[in-house]
Structure formats: C-alpha cells, structure tokens
Amino acid sequence: MGFKGTTVIAIKKNGKTVVAADGQVTFGHTVLKSNAIKIRKLLNGKILAGFAGSTSDAITLFEKFEEKIKAKGDGLVDIKRAAVDLAKDWRSDKILHKLEAMMLVADSKNILLISGTGDVVEPEEDVVSIGSGGNYAYSAALAYMENKKLSAFEVALRSLKIAARVCIYTNSNIVLEEIENE
C-alpha cells in the first residue's frame, strides 16, 4: 500500500504561467488529507514547481532542484540546465534513484516535466499535466486553450475541476500559483 494520486497542471497563456494542483492525499483506499499544498514558488517567485507522487520524495526533489538553480551563482536562472542536472543525479544517485515522484517546473519562458525515471520533457503545447488525473486535466486544458477569452488561471482551474469529477484520486481543493511572463 502506498500514497497514490494527485493532479498537477502547468499552463502558459496570454503572458502568464500557472501551476495548479488539487489537495488530495490518498493512502491505499483512504483519503488522508484534502487540502495538501503540492506546488511551491522557488527563487523568490520566479519559478513554480508542482509534484505528484510521494510527498517526502517530492520535497527532496524540490530541495535538489533549488540547489541546482542556485549552484550557478551568477544570478542567471536556467531551469532547463537545472532540470537536466537534477535528472542526471536522479538517474545515477543510489538514493535519488529510488524516489517516487514527478515534477513540473515552470518559469516565465519554459514549462518542463521531470519524470521519475530522470527524463526531462519540454512539452510541444503550452500545457502539461501529471498525476493520476493528469490525462483528464491535460485533455480539458487542450480544449480550453482554444478559447481566447480564458486566461491561463481559468484554463488551469477548469481543467482541474474536470479531473476532480472523473479521477477518484483528485479533489476540487485547488491551489494555483501564477507568474508574469517576460
């Protein structure tokens, strides 16, 4: 028995980047918490990150990712480089290799998915979603993205609400964070 499910989505639209997640934590067949926070602002709010999977593993990955960002020391933020460096460590480190989590990271220019196998994927669309309800949220977001009147915030919120209606491991206690694109 283990912790299961969540839904996290990242969207870029109309000069904004949003990362949003539901709040449900499930252990086996039991909902343990309905208002967990699964997204974080990093580097003084310049980067948004969200996770699906084991909470303790995700916190470890947040910390490692933030270390990779700060390691450069020149003040320039390159989430692609940091994500690749994290993925290299994830694949080669005996302890990190056992972590069971996925991450979405986004800044004003990029959205990246960092998988549990150490892959880094930059989606073709300005939408990506992970977790048990990820496919539902992703499909809904692709449809909502065609509506020019909807903001990134509205697309994320509506997409997660759809996922919550369909996925038993996703709820409608949604937390959203937003940054302005450069």
From Swiss-Prot:
Activity regulation note: Allosterically activated by HslU binding.
Reactions listed under catalytic activity: ATP-dependent cleavage of peptide bonds with broad specificity
Keyword field contains Cytoplasm: yes
EC identifiers of the protein: 3.4.25.2
GO cellular component: HslUV protease complex; proteasome core complex
Entry-linked CDD domains: protease_HslV
Keywords recorded for this protein, A-Z: Allosteric enzyme, Cytoplasm, Hydrolase, Metal-binding, Protease, Sodium, Stress response, Threonine protease
Binding of Na(+), residues: A164, C167, T170
Subcellular location: Cytoplasm
Keyword Protease: yes
MF (Gene Ontology): metal ion binding; threonine-type endopeptidase activity
GO biological process, one term: proteolysis involved in protein catabolic process
Subcellular location, principal: cytoplasm
Domain of life from the UniProt record: Bacteria
Residue numbers annotated as active site: T6
Family according to the record: Belongs to the peptidase T1B family. HslV subfamily.
Role: Protease subunit of a proteasome-like degradation complex believed to be a general protein degrading machinery.
Oligomer status and interactors: A double ring-shaped homohexamer of HslV is capped on each side by a ring-shaped HslU homohexamer. The assembly of the HslU/HslV complex is dependent on binding of ATP.
Record's protein name: ATP-dependent protease subunit HslV
Organism per entry: Borreliella afzelii (strain PKo)
